[in-house]
């Protein structure tokens, strides 16, 4: 027990720090109101109600975008139940928010202990990694999946380290377990980025093994890790496989639309190039790693919120500074805050580049540079283009600036290695070979901070963005433009200088601790404690700028967002089994950026990062233009739909949009408007018009009346048995008789064979029967379903229950069994070792 006492103390310290940061909100039960979290609640309400009512999970919901799979809405599979139990134990059953910081610290601590670092130094490492500013920016933004995935990456790499340190079985089990946990956390982008880090590590261990003539050991460890990776992946195979299949149909998949000219270069098997690089870190902005507000801070902060800036403000413009411009003046469209790793941490990292020996140092330095260069995105397009075009899967992810998480990992890791070198060898910095490195480190960190403090303009050519200048020219009289720009420049220089002085003095204080230790004036334990306190104060205070107690609200605030309004009540009085609602409140920006509507209704709009690509293309080509026409027409008609031209919104009608929610008054009130022109749940058509490609298909919708003609790609001609003429008259009827999100039942009657179009979103995996006999489903009108229905009276049933889930679940259970066997073997061998010692 005594052996594990330092570890228990470190874990207890992590718990105390986590509770302390979120005090008193954690004690009072207050929560953060997070847009992404609230959006998830709204989008998932139909699925939640179905689970509570039936005890089964639906893999399809009609709550947003007309309908989509639930694979990326809190994905859950039976095979992961036991894994979630293990996760709860690992988290020590700590409450929300508190647990996030705790697992972030614990994961890095495990990694450092795997390297053989002392518990006390590993504890410091856990703190400086976990308190990197980016993580505390993720929490209020609601990017919890990303946060948790990042928390499980250091212990995953710990397994890699253990395996290469010849603890094969333990390393394999740890790797498999934490790969499984991070994939379960469902942010593949972060896992993908850290695959590059692992490759750097493997390269370093290969070099080390080659030099030591231990290549058999290297290949043995690599084989075990490869098996562990397969096990970890297979535990989550249900999620991974269905996410992969789904991604092909989303904006991350390849569009079938052919574009010409410059736009054609954007078309690939992944996201558009501009979309991928829209959030690119500025080259000069990289200095935020050392000085947090080197680009002003966050986009959400006005100039009036900065004391340093307002000390330089011209009182004449104070009213403007309370609204515009924002503190941030970097190259990203918007940012909640900078990526800051700690001034003295950065100092130790740079110092580590000189005093730490071995291939692992070069791996960490290489990974850091790699991360920074790729984070520049459109500001460094040579490398970015290469990765988008040639590196598998890189073009599936947007916001390239987020690859800086690699630097946030490698910088504190090398910093701890450097501190270990210093504390274990007090004369390290006295050595002649290290003096130059120490001087260079001071110049590159404290020196840069000092220059930024004294002359911020030395690194930047301007402090006003192009967009700001354009807005100022529109807003200000010509005679005020130059004085205002000069004053704003002075204020932004003051913001930079304030934080630069801060970083400079933090580095100097840290160096003082090292100097006193080197002079034998301070013991190693006190030096470590002093540095730990310095780093904690530094990073804690920066993080409080972006996540503080004022942001926490009572839990009731979350539910208030979904309180049923009078408009909702009025719409819900409609007992029709299935129809859609289109919310015009906040149009045009809000319709596809909120899920409050989806909480109570089946929405045409919605918010999700991975919507179906064809639906997005319909939004761009038809839905948004029709919304503009409809908004203007309904407003002009004063809500009297009988005087509105229904031909202006045929796509909305074919989506069975029965209700529009329109703003009424200036206090956020809304009113429902019944759309009498909605086509209903399904209809027979007179004609099937086959087209050769997606462009013809989406363009044809401009020229046809969907209730009469169905536009179908020739690829689906066989599914409709080549029918070109449908059959539609007053005797042909079809009615929805039963509705579940994943199962629809219709009664149809027709004197002759005909084609029925359903106002449901087409997606591979939906199956259909007519009177119990399987039939094919075709795609019609770009996004809808169609079936060839024979003459007579029939029951048509459609359901979504992919058989692939059963297959992948079997694989997942087999992988879990392998992991359990590994744990049992490890426990047995450890028990035998203990028995032999006794």
Language-model segments: residues:
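Conserved luminal/periplasmic juxtamembrane motif of membrane-embedded glycan-processing enzymes
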Residues: 2-747, 753-757, 761
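Active-site-proximal, structured, solvent-exposed surfaces of multi-pass membrane proteins
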Residues: 347, 658, 705-838
